[in-house]
């Protein structure tokens, strides 16, 4: 009988997922992969299985990955110092060589290999391939003690100007799963290091994706009592930022999700990547495992 109960439980999970599979079949979703999910073997495996399953049941997943800790590790081994300003890496030419080597090389190919080992057909890209990510230099704005805005030069740190969607559509219309390293190139051929959340958001916007999923090391967006907010409208997010409930390091991540939704992505999800199979749970279950952000005023029912 215990085995029968397990079978019934699995059947219930599948029947709960079915309406979501039908609803999202043929839709594109962009998943930002980073944090603990990239360093824990069990989480790595569950992430790869999630991506392969999404492709198998008819969705078009696109992966954008980070890799800051891996960059830090190689810089340390090489004896190079990399400064940060408000969490942004100051990237000179020597640092950029390491960033490109790690993100476009070892990290990208290890994710491709991971997905392929679990039955997928992943293909690795950087923003330089086919001019996929067109970029320009990012000038960071900060207020000085007098309240005046000053621009800070972060070196070869960029922002996204445009996405060549035809490069990605070539793969999503086939069996391939694109895996993108967040490197961009400008009109002069200069390479830029770009925040992976921002790249994922801009890719999702450009493709008119159904969903943007940001895997993080936290449970999602929390209220003033540190309780998880499972669903938010864009108006509610604006209010929570204005009142200081969303603050610090969460502002850029939530801002990226907010911009994507305002730019045409149907919904954005800030998801706890420490939970095995977090991506599947967020998409294919009634409650999800993170915070959903959508233009609709009643977001909680939209998982």
Curated annotation (Swiss-Prot):
Binding site for substrate: 67-68, 89, 193
InterPro entries hit by this protein: AceGlu_kinase-like_sf, AcgluKinase_fam, ArgB, Asp/Glu/Uridylate_kinase, NAGK-C
Keywords carried by this UniProt record: Amino-acid biosynthesis, Arginine biosynthesis, ATP-binding, Cytoplasm, Kinase, Nucleotide-binding, Transferase
Alphabetized Gene3D superfamilies for the sequence: Acetylglutamate kinase-like
GO cellular-component term (any): cytoplasm
GO molecular function term, any single one: ATP binding
Cellular localisation: Cytoplasm
Family: Belongs to the acetylglutamate kinase family. ArgB subfamily.
Protein name: Acetylglutamate kinase
The species this protein was found in: Acinetobacter baylyi (strain ATCC 33305 / BD413 / ADP1)
UniProt lineage: Bacteria, Pseudomonadati, Pseudomonadota, Gammaproteobacteria, Moraxellales
Gene from which this protein is expressed: argB
């Amino acid at each position: 009988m215990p085995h029968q109960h397990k079978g019934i439980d699995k059947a219930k999970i599948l029947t709960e997922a079915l309406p979501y599979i039908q609803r999202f079949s043929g839709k594109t979703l962009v998943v930002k992969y980073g944090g603990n999910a990239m360093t824990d073997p069990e989480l790595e495996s569950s992430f790869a299985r999630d991506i392969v399953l999404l492709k198998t049941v008819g969705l078009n997943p696109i992966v954008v990955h980070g890799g800051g800790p891996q960059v830090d590790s190689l810089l340390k081994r090489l004896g190079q110092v990399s400064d940060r300003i408000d969490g942004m890496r100051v990237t000179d030419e020597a640092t950029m060589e390491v960033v490109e080597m790690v993100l476009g090389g070892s990290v990208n190919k290890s994710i491709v290999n991971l997905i392929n080992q679990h039955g997928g057909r992943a293909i690795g890209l950087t923003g330089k391939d086919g001019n996929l990510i067109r970029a320009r230099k990012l000038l960071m704005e900060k207020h000085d003690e007098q309240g005046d805005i000053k621009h800070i030069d972060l070196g070869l740190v960029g922002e996204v100007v445009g996405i060549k969607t035809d490069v990605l559509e070539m793969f999503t219309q086939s069996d391939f799963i694109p895996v993108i390293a967040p490197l961009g190139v400008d009109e002069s051929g200069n390479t830029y290091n770009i925040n992976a959340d921002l790249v994922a958001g801009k890719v999702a916007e450009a493709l008119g994706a159904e969903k943007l999923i940001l895997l993080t090391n936290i449970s999602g967006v929390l209220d003033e009592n540190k309780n998880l907010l499972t669903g938010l409208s864009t108006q509610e997010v604006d209010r929570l930022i204005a009142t200081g409930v969303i603050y610090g390091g969460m502002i850029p991540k939530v801002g990226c999700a907010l911009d994507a939704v305002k730019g045409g992505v149907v919904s954005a999800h800030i998801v706890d990547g420490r939970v095995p199979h977090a991506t599947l749970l967020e998409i294919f279950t009634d409650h999800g495992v993170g915070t959903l952000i959508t233009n609709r005023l009643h977001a909680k029912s939209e998982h």
